[in-house]
Each structure stands twice: as C-alpha cells, then as structure tokens.
Amino acid sequence: MSLLTEVETYVLSIVPSGPLKAEIAQRLEDVFAGKNTDLEALMEWLKTRPILSPLTKGILGFVFTLTCPSERGLQRRRFVQNALNGNGDPNNMDKAVKLYRKLKREITFHGAKEVALSYSAGALASCMGLIYNRMGTVTTEVAFGLVCATCEQIADSQHQSHRQMVTTTNPLIRHENRMVLASTTAKAMEQMAGSSEQAAEAMEVASQARQMVQAMRTIGTHPSSSAGLKDDLLENLQAYQKRMGVQMQRFK
C-alpha cells in the first residue's frame, strides 16, 4: 500500500458515512494526485462543511496543507488552529512538545506512527498544531505518520462506542437502530437506481420501506416488530444489483 493510500484510508475512517464522505474522498484523491492545488479554495470549502467535528476538519486541513504546494506567506486558518490546540489543556501541550522532540529523530512514516501511538489523541492533535503553526518542522512522511496515529486513536474510540450500541440489549435502541439502517439502505437504493425498468422497481421497494419506517415511528410499535426489516431490504437491493450486473461485495 502506498503512503498516500494509507493516509487516505486512515483519514476517511474518522469521517461519518454519507454523501459528504464520498465528496471528501474525491477531494483527497485529487489533492494526492496533484489535480487540485488551490489550497485557499480547499480550506474555504472544508470550513463550511456540515456534520464534521472541528477536530476532523482540523486534521483534514492539516493534510491538505501538507500536500498542496502553497505560498510561504499563506495565512494559517483559525478553524484548523483552534481544532489542533489540544482543547487548550497545558498537559496536552507538554506531551505534544515531548512527542515533537521524538518525531524530530524519526525519518520514516511507520517509525513516526509507532512513536505517536503511545500518546493520547489530545496530545497528538496538539503536536499537529505545533507543526501547523510552523513552531516546529518535520518531514512530510513523519507528519503523515502523526496524522494516521491520531486517526487510529479516534477510530478506536468510535468503534468502541459503535460496538456498544450494536451489542446493547436495550430493545428500544436496537429497534431504532434497525429502522435507521433500513432508511439508510432505502436511500442507497434510490441513489443507485438509474432510469431502467428495474430502477423503478427498486425505487418502489425503497419508498415502501421508508413509508413503513415512518408509520412505525408515528404510531409506535413493539421493539421486535422491526426485526428483519433491514435484512429484507438488503435482499431486495442485492437481487436488484444482480439483475443490473452490479456487485457490491459487502453492503451492510
């Protein structure tokens, strides 16, 4: 796996799924391929994106700044600086300085990532802030190692809370989660549908599923009534894909 592929993988792992994620993936690919070099416009676009947390925006801004060739005097952006200040915690700043000194001795991406993984996400973000504010310099490879370690820390905690939700025994949460997933699947079916006959059929199935979820939410139902709803939808979607000659490995 190339270095940039690895960076893209880690960065996208902390972006919530949805149309915005696809858009960010495209921007990252363009930046890494040298097709998009207008850092000013990229940062303006990033600043106004909804849904993303300030830290995710800060990390993306840091990656864009590292990758785009920019004028030396180009102003640093406040929204990135604020996100990478380690919540203003002096403890994070102390650790960030110690980490920075260690990173100065590293020359490889993997070496930097290994060193960085033993620090908290707050200290890692502060260290990125030091580099972003030009208070310290490391090689681009080392900076990318720091980015990936930060994303791994964040993705780990996200995965943990996601797993807690999936394994919860609370029937109300499980029921709501099934309905949310059914709605999301219905949306995906509508987006994939082209203009063929089968597309109309897929739209119909998706629309029915949405109406069912809406009705269940309006009148309130027994928590077990949604069991199988998402699975039925997925079966319909996979059957539709086969007829259309589209194969999605794991659509879950």
Swiss-Prot record:
Keywords: Host nucleus, Membrane, RNA-binding, Viral matrix protein, Virion. Pfam families: Flu_M1, Flu_M1_C. InterPro entries: Flu_matrix_M1, Flu_matrix_M1_C, Flu_matrix_M1_N, Flu_matrix_M1_N_sub1, Flu_matrix_M1_N_sub2, INFV_M1. Residues 165-252 are annotated as: RNP-binding. A motif (Nuclear localization signal) lies at residues 101-105. GO terms for molecular function: RNA binding; structural constituent of virion. Signal peptide: none annotated. It is a peripheral membrane protein. The keyword Membrane applies. SMART domains: Flu_M1_C (SM00759). Most abundant protein in virion. When expressed alone can form virus-like particles in transfected cells. Belongs to the influenza viruses Matrix protein M1 family. Plays critical roles in virus replication, from virus entry and uncoating to assembly and budding of the virus particle. M1 binding to ribonucleocapsids (RNPs) in nucleus seems to inhibit viral transcription. Interaction of viral NEP with M1-RNP is thought to promote nuclear export of the complex, which is targeted to the virion assembly site at the apical plasma membrane in polarized epithelial cells. Interactions with NA and HA may bring M1, a non-raft-associated protein, into lipid rafts. Forms a continuous shell on the inner side of the lipid bilayer in virion, where it binds the RNP. Determines the virion's shape: spherical or filamentous. Clinical isolates of influenza are characterized by the presence of significant proportion of filamentous virions, whereas after multiple passage on eggs or cell culture, virions have only spherical morphology. Filamentous virions are thought to be important to infect neighboring cells, and spherical virions more suited to spread through aerosol between hosts organisms. Homodimer and homomultimer. Interacts with NEP. Binds ribonucleocapsid by both interacting with genomic RNA and NP protein. May interact with HA and NA. Cannot bind NP without genomic RNA. This is Matrix protein 1. The lineage of its organism: Viruses, Riboviria, Orthornavirae, Negarnaviricota, Polyploviricotina. The gene is M.
